[in-house]
Amino acid sequence: MKKLLIGIFVFILSFTSKAFSDGHGIKMGIILGFTGPIETLTPAMAASAELAFKEASDSGSLLGGKYIKAMRGDSTCADSAAGTTAAQGLIDGGVVAIMGADCSGVTTAIADNAAIPNGVVMISPSATSPALTSINDNGYFFRTAPSDARGGEILAKITKDRKVKSVAITYTNNDYGKDCNGDCFGDAFI
Protein backbone atom coordinates (compact mmCIF):
# COMPACT_ATOMS: atom_id res chain seq x y z
CA MET A 1 0.00 0.00 0.00
CA LYS A 2 2.79 2.39 0.94
CA LYS A 3 4.64 1.77 -2.33
CA LEU A 4 1.42 2.29 -4.29
CA LEU A 5 0.82 5.62 -2.55
CA ILE A 6 4.39 6.79 -3.22
CA GLY A 7 4.21 5.62 -6.82
CA ILE A 8 0.99 7.48 -7.53
CA PHE A 9 2.30 10.67 -5.92
CA VAL A 10 5.58 10.50 -7.85
CA PHE A 11 3.76 9.90 -11.13
CA ILE A 12 1.46 12.86 -10.59
CA LEU A 13 4.29 15.10 -9.42
CA SER A 14 6.29 14.40 -12.54
CA PHE A 15 3.67 16.33 -14.52
CA THR A 16 3.29 19.40 -12.35
CA SER A 17 5.58 22.42 -12.20
CA LYS A 18 4.05 23.55 -8.89
CA ALA A 19 5.82 20.61 -7.25
CA PHE A 20 9.11 22.47 -7.27
CA SER A 21 7.92 25.95 -6.35
CA ASP A 22 10.23 26.26 -3.33
CA GLY A 23 13.39 24.77 -4.85
CA HIS A 24 13.87 21.18 -3.79
CA GLY A 25 10.84 20.58 -1.59
CA ILE A 26 7.54 19.07 -2.66
CA LYS A 27 4.64 20.10 -0.44
CA MET A 28 2.16 17.30 0.22
CA GLY A 29 -1.01 17.74 2.26
CA ILE A 30 -2.35 15.33 4.83
CA ILE A 31 -5.97 16.09 5.67
CA LEU A 32 -7.64 13.84 8.21
CA GLY A 33 -10.09 14.13 11.10
CA PHE A 34 -7.59 15.07 13.81
CA THR A 35 -10.62 16.29 15.75
CA GLY A 36 -14.07 14.76 15.59
CA PRO A 37 -15.54 11.25 15.67
CA ILE A 38 -12.48 9.34 14.42
CA GLU A 39 -9.72 11.42 16.00
CA THR A 40 -8.22 8.35 17.69
CA LEU A 41 -7.66 6.67 14.31
CA THR A 42 -6.07 9.51 12.40
CA PRO A 43 -2.67 9.83 14.13
CA ALA A 44 -1.63 6.41 12.81
CA MET A 45 -2.94 7.23 9.32
CA ALA A 46 -0.99 10.50 9.27
CA ALA A 47 2.14 8.87 10.66
CA SER A 48 1.96 6.23 7.92
CA ALA A 49 1.82 8.87 5.19
CA GLU A 50 4.63 10.85 6.80
CA LEU A 51 6.76 7.70 7.03
CA ALA A 52 6.17 6.98 3.34
CA PHE A 53 7.09 10.58 2.51
CA LYS A 54 10.25 10.30 4.65
CA GLU A 55 11.32 7.06 2.99
CA ALA A 56 10.80 8.54 -0.46
CA SER A 57 12.72 11.67 0.53
CA ASP A 58 15.55 9.79 2.25
CA SER A 59 16.06 7.55 -0.77
CA GLY A 60 17.70 10.43 -2.60
CA SER A 61 16.15 9.23 -5.84
CA LEU A 62 12.83 11.06 -5.66
CA LEU A 63 12.74 13.19 -8.79
CA GLY A 64 16.45 13.90 -8.70
CA GLY A 65 16.91 14.27 -4.95
CA LYS A 66 13.78 16.18 -4.02
CA TYR A 67 12.24 15.84 -0.57
CA ILE A 68 8.62 15.88 0.57
CA LYS A 69 7.43 18.42 3.11
CA ALA A 70 4.22 17.21 4.80
CA MET A 71 1.61 19.79 5.74
CA ARG A 72 -1.35 18.78 7.93
CA GLY A 73 -4.96 19.94 7.88
CA ASP A 74 -7.96 18.90 9.99
CA SER A 75 -10.95 17.58 8.03
CA THR A 76 -12.89 17.02 11.29
CA CYS A 77 -14.49 14.05 9.49
CA ALA A 78 -17.91 15.52 10.21
CA ASP A 79 -17.93 19.19 9.14
CA SER A 80 -17.69 19.52 5.36
CA ALA A 81 -17.28 23.30 5.46
CA ALA A 82 -14.42 23.10 7.96
CA GLY A 83 -12.76 20.32 5.97
CA THR A 84 -13.04 22.27 2.74
CA THR A 85 -11.59 25.38 4.40
CA ALA A 86 -8.68 23.34 5.77
CA ALA A 87 -8.03 21.78 2.37
CA GLN A 88 -8.15 25.15 0.64
CA GLY A 89 -5.61 26.39 3.20
CA LEU A 90 -3.27 23.55 2.27
CA ILE A 91 -3.77 24.26 -1.43
CA ASP A 92 -3.14 27.97 -0.89
CA GLY A 93 0.01 26.92 1.00
CA GLY A 94 1.31 25.23 -2.14
CA VAL A 95 0.57 21.51 -1.75
CA VAL A 96 0.50 19.61 -5.03
CA ALA A 97 -1.34 16.56 -3.69
CA ILE A 98 -3.40 15.60 -0.65
CA MET A 99 -3.51 12.32 1.26
CA GLY A 100 -7.06 12.30 2.56
CA ALA A 101 -9.63 12.99 3.47
CA ASP A 102 -10.93 10.23 5.63
CA CYS A 103 -14.72 10.22 5.95
CA SER A 104 -16.74 10.05 2.74
CA GLY A 105 -18.93 13.13 3.21
CA VAL A 106 -16.08 15.50 3.93
CA THR A 107 -13.96 13.83 1.25
CA THR A 108 -16.65 14.53 -1.34
CA ALA A 109 -16.92 18.16 -0.24
CA ILE A 110 -13.15 18.68 -0.35
CA ALA A 111 -12.86 17.03 -3.76
CA ASP A 112 -15.75 19.01 -5.24
CA ASN A 113 -14.97 22.40 -3.70
CA ALA A 114 -11.19 22.56 -3.28
CA ALA A 115 -9.04 19.82 -4.80
CA ILE A 116 -10.60 19.19 -8.21
CA PRO A 117 -11.23 22.87 -9.08
CA ASN A 118 -7.59 23.61 -8.20
CA GLY A 119 -6.14 20.60 -10.02
CA VAL A 120 -4.83 18.97 -6.83
CA VAL A 121 -4.69 15.17 -6.62
CA MET A 122 -6.38 13.48 -3.65
CA ILE A 123 -5.81 9.93 -2.44
CA SER A 124 -8.17 8.89 0.35
CA PRO A 125 -7.15 6.00 2.58
CA SER A 126 -10.64 5.39 3.93
CA ALA A 127 -13.49 7.14 2.10
CA THR A 128 -15.76 4.28 1.00
CA SER A 129 -18.98 5.87 -0.27
CA PRO A 130 -20.20 4.32 -3.53
CA ALA A 131 -20.92 7.86 -4.76
CA LEU A 132 -17.17 8.55 -4.91
CA THR A 133 -16.83 5.90 -7.62
CA SER A 134 -18.60 8.14 -10.11
CA ILE A 135 -17.49 11.55 -8.86
CA ASN A 136 -16.64 13.93 -11.72
CA ASP A 137 -12.99 14.14 -10.70
CA ASN A 138 -11.17 14.86 -13.98
CA GLY A 139 -8.66 12.22 -12.91
CA TYR A 140 -7.75 13.92 -9.61
CA PHE A 141 -9.40 11.60 -7.04
CA PHE A 142 -8.20 8.15 -5.99
CA ARG A 143 -8.84 5.93 -3.00
CA THR A 144 -7.15 2.89 -1.55
CA ALA A 145 -10.18 1.44 0.27
CA PRO A 146 -12.86 -0.34 -1.77
CA SER A 147 -16.36 1.05 -2.09
CA ASP A 148 -19.02 0.05 0.45
CA ALA A 149 -20.97 -1.32 -2.50
CA ARG A 150 -18.34 -4.03 -2.87
CA GLY A 151 -18.29 -4.66 0.88
CA GLY A 152 -22.06 -5.10 0.90
CA GLU A 153 -21.87 -7.59 -1.96
CA ILE A 154 -19.23 -9.65 -0.17
CA LEU A 155 -21.13 -9.65 3.12
CA ALA A 156 -24.33 -10.69 1.32
CA LYS A 157 -22.49 -13.52 -0.44
CA ILE A 158 -21.04 -14.80 2.83
CA THR A 159 -24.49 -14.65 4.42
CA LYS A 160 -26.07 -16.56 1.50
CA ASP A 161 -23.23 -19.12 1.49
CA ARG A 162 -24.06 -19.86 5.12
CA LYS A 163 -27.65 -20.54 4.08
CA VAL A 164 -29.08 -17.67 6.09
CA LYS A 165 -32.61 -17.07 4.80
CA SER A 166 -33.53 -13.80 6.51
CA VAL A 167 -31.68 -10.99 8.23
CA ALA A 168 -32.51 -7.87 10.19
CA ILE A 169 -30.41 -4.85 9.30
CA THR A 170 -29.73 -2.10 11.81
CA TYR A 171 -27.46 0.79 10.99
CA THR A 172 -26.59 4.33 11.92
CA ASN A 173 -28.99 6.63 10.10
CA ASN A 174 -26.41 8.59 8.13
CA ASP A 175 -24.76 8.26 4.73
CA TYR A 176 -22.14 5.82 6.01
CA GLY A 177 -24.66 3.56 7.74
CA LYS A 178 -27.06 3.54 4.81
CA ASP A 179 -24.35 2.91 2.23
CA CYS A 180 -22.29 0.42 4.18
CA ASN A 181 -24.96 -1.72 5.78
CA GLY A 182 -28.38 -0.72 4.58
CA ASP A 183 -28.51 -0.22 0.85
CA CYS A 184 -25.44 -2.14 -0.31
CA PHE A 185 -25.96 -5.25 1.79
CA GLY A 186 -29.73 -5.20 1.48
CA ASP A 187 -29.70 -4.83 -2.30
CA ALA A 188 -27.14 -7.62 -2.71
CA PHE A 189 -28.89 -10.00 -0.29
CA ILE A 190 -32.31 -9.82 -1.92
Language-model features, listed with the residues they occupy:
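Signal peptide-proximal N-terminal region
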Residues: A47-A70
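Extracytoplasmic "Venus flytrap"
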Residues: G29-E50, G73-S80, D102, T172-K178
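Structural motif
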Residues: K66-D92, R150-I154
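Immediate post-signal peptide segment of exported/extracytoplasmic ligand-binding proteins
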Residues: A19-I30, S61-Y67, K160-S166
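Short, low-complexity disordered leader/linker segments with a strong preference
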Residues: M1-K27, D92
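C-terminal intramolecular chaperone/auto-processing assembly modules
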Residues: A52, D183-I190
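Short, solvent-exposed loop/turn and secondary-structure capping segments
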Residues: T40-P43, G83, I110-A111, S134-I135
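Extracytoplasmic ligand/sensor domains, especially the bilobed periplasmic-binding protein
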Residues: D92-C184
